[in-house]
């Protein structure tokens, strides 16, 4: 490693193992030796092979730099490439996450009303920040919501996101929309309305929330027509006024010819849900986008009365046109290479300063760590297919891969068990400068009611022995702890896990996913090898 300078990137990250692989490249878990944090390093291969893919990656790394928020996944670092004009791969360092909401929903039938409330609150809080920056995510779905053992969620995958400017032509702005149909707003099922709004993301959040409540997708359409059919089965036929404002003539004819359907009461569709939650869900799933609340309005709903706090629901500064001027012109691979290199320099302040001052050397004075990483990644890739890790979730496109960890031991595991070992849920805000992870939550003895018989989630609790400031105590008013089902007078085990849903739970693709016990061998206790609960009962951290 004699080619490293004071940047020391190669020495900084200790590569551990491959945790994901796909058409984009490879994901490895690593230890940041400077901070002690677990991270996920994504090697994205041949990013300039297709201009569209390179543009998507540029868009995402730029947005994740600009949108810094606790409910949005964070890029911690991007490694310096060995050559400014010839590099083909990039290495992006993310915070390490334990799972995604798709796996949590599929694996758990014991989520409580407190979980539902806090999950939705985080999603809307993150969405408020995104929308006030004039950004539309456009691809919100459970697989693009990361989750950890503390019930903290983060929005990821901004490859299809767009920044909205007042002079952006609508037709151009939406020509490449390819998001997942099941979470697609009705106005996107056939170019319904002349102007699209952030309400498309609100609809997606409503679909995700409904899926949390029931454990299965709300609108699993097989095609666009079927999607409209099952939407109107629940919501009823749109009003003539709504239909008249639809710009697509075929869509207008189809809806006008549709038999008149009466809406199904949400209390009938979701009989066990909180009435306040149902009223908010009805607003988010309004057929007409103008009837849906903004993220800020939804956060002010009575449903969040006991946890909402405007002080921790920040807005973003609108993103300037200059940041995304490349979206408004035809660009070449070399243009994108230069723009991505400029984004990488944001994580190398000294070189960025020289770049901006025009004093940058023609050759690299600060050699890259990429050469060192290539050898490690190549070795791990070679051994990846030998049964040491579980198969990673498949990607739908080539934007930055999700920082999602799959569990591994000496045998393959099914994706249905990825979140089997998420050990506890702690409702807390990531904005806080909390204590060291070794001391926070060191005592998590239940102080409220024990879990109901046969259930795994106890009551909402506070910290046991954590000394916090008055401000932090106000912040930390609500907490959900996952406890195993226990018999009366029995002790609480140190670790607990999300129970599995029915193994025939429907997947996002509409297929039935089953677990083949012949491939997994005899049952044995699941252990979260990546971010385990420690022997004293503390859950894993980011």
Curated annotation (Swiss-Prot):
Sequence segments annotated as region (Disordered): 388-412, 482-542
SMART domains tied to this protein: S_TKc
GO CC, any one term: cytoplasm
Catalytic activity: L-seryl-[protein] + ATP = O-phospho-L-seryl-[protein] + ADP + H(+); L-threonyl-[protein] + ATP = O-phospho-L-threonyl-[protein] + ADP + H(+)
SUPFAM superfamilies: Protein kinase-like (PK-like) (SSF56112)
Known EC number: 2.7.11.24
Compositionally biased tracts (Polar residues): 488-507
One Pfam family in the UniProt entry: Pkinase
Swiss-Prot/TrEMBL domain comment: The TXY motif contains the threonine and tyrosine residues whose phosphorylation activates the MAP kinases.
Listed name of the protein: Mitogen-activated protein kinase 14
Gene responsible for this protein: MPK14
């Amino acid at each position: 490693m004699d080619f490293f300078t004071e940047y020391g990137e190669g020495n900084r990250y200790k590569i551990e193992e491959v945790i994901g692989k796909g058409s984009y490249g490879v994901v490895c878990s690593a230890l940041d030796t400077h901070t002690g944090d677990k991270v996920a390093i994504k090697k994205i291969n041949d990013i300039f092979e297709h201009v569209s893919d390179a543009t998507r990656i540029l868009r995402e790394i730029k947005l994740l730099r600009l949108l810094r928020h606790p409910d949005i996944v964070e890029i911690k670092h991007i490694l310096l490439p060995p050559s400014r004009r010839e590099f083909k791969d990039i290495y992006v360092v993310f915070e390490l996450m334990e799972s995604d909401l798709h796996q949590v929903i599929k694996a758990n039938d014991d989520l409580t009303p407190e979980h539902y409330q806090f999950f939705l609150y985080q999603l809307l809080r993150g969405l408020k920040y995104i929308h006030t920056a004039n950004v539309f995510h456009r691809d919100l779905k459970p697989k693009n919501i990361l989750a950890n053992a503390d019930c903290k969620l983060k929005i990821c995958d901004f490859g299809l996101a767009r920044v909205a400017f007042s002079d952006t032509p609508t037709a151009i702005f939406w020509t490449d929309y390819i998001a997942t149909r099941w979470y697609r707003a009705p106005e996107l099922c056939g170019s319904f309305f002349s102007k699209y709004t952030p309400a498309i993301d609100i609809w997606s959040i409503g679909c995700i929330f409904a899926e949390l409540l029931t454990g299965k997708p709300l609108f699993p359409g097989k095609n666009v027509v079927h999607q409209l059919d099952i939407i109107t089965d629940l919501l009823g036929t749109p009003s003539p006024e709504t239909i008249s404002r639809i710009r697509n003539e075929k869509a207008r004819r189809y809806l006008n010819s549709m038999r008149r359907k009466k809406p199904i009461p949400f209390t009938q569709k979701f009989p066990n849900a909180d009435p306040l939650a149902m009223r908010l869900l009805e607003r988010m799933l309004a057929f007409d986008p103008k009837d849906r609340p903004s993220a800020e309005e939804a956060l002010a709903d009575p449903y969040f009365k006991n946890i909402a706090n405007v002080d921790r629901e920040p807005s973003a500064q609108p993103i300037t046109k200059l940041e995304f001027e490349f979206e408004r012109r035809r660009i070449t691979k070399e243009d994108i290479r230069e723009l991505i290199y400029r984004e990488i320099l944001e994580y190398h302040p000294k070189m960025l300063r020289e770049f901006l001052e025009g004093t940058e050397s023609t050759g690299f004075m600060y050699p890259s760590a990429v050469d060192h990483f290539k050898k490690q990644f190549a070795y791990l890739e070679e051994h990846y297919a030998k049964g040491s890790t579980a198969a990673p979730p498949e990607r739908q496109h080539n934007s930055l891969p999700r920082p999602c960890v799959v569990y591994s031991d000496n045998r393959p595991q099914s994706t249905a068990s990825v979140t089997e070992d998420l050990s506890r849920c702690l409702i807390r805000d990531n904005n806080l400068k909390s204590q060291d992870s070794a001391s926070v939550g060191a005592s998590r003895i239940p102080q409220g009611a024990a879990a109901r018989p046969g259930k795994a989630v106890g009551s909402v609790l506070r910290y046991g022995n954590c000394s916090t400031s008055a401000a932090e105590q106000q912040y930390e008013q609500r907490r959900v702890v996952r406890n195993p089902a226990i018999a009366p007078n029995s002790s609480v085990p140190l670790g607990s896990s999300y129970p599995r849903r029915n193994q025939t739970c429907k997947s996002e693709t509409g297929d039935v996913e089953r677990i083949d016990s012949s491939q997994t061998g005899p049952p044995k206790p699941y252990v979260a090898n990546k971010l385990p609960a420690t022997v004293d009962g503390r859950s894993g951290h980011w």
